[in-house]
A protein has these predicted regions:
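Hydrophobic/aromatic beta-strand elements that line small-molecule binding cavities or substrate pockets
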Residues: 123-124, 147, 193-195
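Low-complexity or membrane-interfacial segments used for flexible interactions
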Residues: 1-119, 166-170, 175-261
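Acidic, aromatic-enriched beta-alpha/helix-loop junctions
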Residues: 116-132
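Non-cytosolic head/periplasmic domains of membrane-anchored proteins
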Residues: 129-180
Length: 261
């Protein structure tokens, strides 16, 4: 999903919500005519206007991005810096974008479309041209997460520790031979985190809460910025990204449980 499509979809959704709230307010006024409680009605109308304004801004931003889109032939493995966005789509979950706003790849649920993966929770990293670059599968034997290349060869796993600290994810990075690479500990509200190889090279680095001014014109202020390590192989790039995606999704799920309890 290109960035302009992302903003257009979100803008349309906001406008629909604003329309729904406005109609709800009008219906409430009609049903209580002569004895209207203006407080809630005014709040509903204000909320609808806020959604309308945000939606209109996002639609306008999408149109501007579409006019100024820059295309090139770079592939996922040619790029080392990405911005990660949650996609407003049923099947696709996360999108990787270059700092100039070009969509490069995204995760999607694929186990439901392949009979061999029936009853398994498998995600694919799909390039913008539709090619599957990697597979990610949850709960594989004794591991919480396994990462595979495009030929479905295992490149590494992640196993969470039995004892988890409050507000963090702890676990071990394992290679395809089930040899421990390193231990990681990521807080739910981290500002910056990195994963390393056995020889202490950086696999991947992720920052939140910081956005260069030029990039902020295209993205939000608190979205993750991902930088792949230097001097690492393509397999290691897939592995590092797979682990990071698991950590971010786990943090999201566990934070929602905390707020819902």
């Amino acid at each position: 999903m290109e960035l302009f499509e992302y903003y257009k979809k979100r803008g349309k959704l906001k406008c629909l919500i604003g329309t729904g709230l406005f109609l709800y307010g009008l219906i409430g006024m009609y049903n209580t005519w002569g004895n209207i409680n203006w407080g809630p009605v005014i709040l509903i109308i204000i909320a609808s206007l806020v959604f309308f304004c945000i939606g209109f801004w996002q639609l306008r931003k999408g149109n501007l991005l579409e006019k100024n889109i820059v295309k090139n032939d770079l592939t996922f493995l040619d790029i080392d810096t990405y911005v990660l966005l949650e996609l407003p789509s049923n099947n696709k979950h996360l999108g990787l974008y270059t700092p100039d706003g070009r969509y490069v790849a995204g995760t999607k649920m694929i186990s439901s479309t392949l009979p061999i993966l029936k009853n398994k929770k498998v995600f694919g990293l799909e390039a913008s041209d539709g090619e599957i670059l990697a597979y990610f599968q949850s709960e594989v034997e004794n591991y919480d997460w396994a990462i595979y290349d495009s030929n479905y060869n295992c490149v590494g796993m992640f196993k969470e520790n039995m004892i988890q600290g409050f507000g963090m994810v702890r676990g071990s990075l394992m290679n395809e031979k089930e040899i421990k690479i390193s231990e990681i500990e990521v807080e739910f509200d981290f500002f910056e985190t990195s994963f390393h190889t056995m020889d202490d090279r950086i696999l991947i680095n992720c920052k939140r809460g910081y956005m260069p001014l030029e990039w902020s014109e295209r993205f939000g202020l608190n979205v993750p910025i991902i930088k792949l390590g230097n001097n690492i192989s393509n397999t290691e790039k897939i592995f590092g990204l797979g682990i990071l995606l698991y950590i971010l999704e786990t943090i999201k799920v566990r934070k929602s449980r905390i707020f819902n309890d």
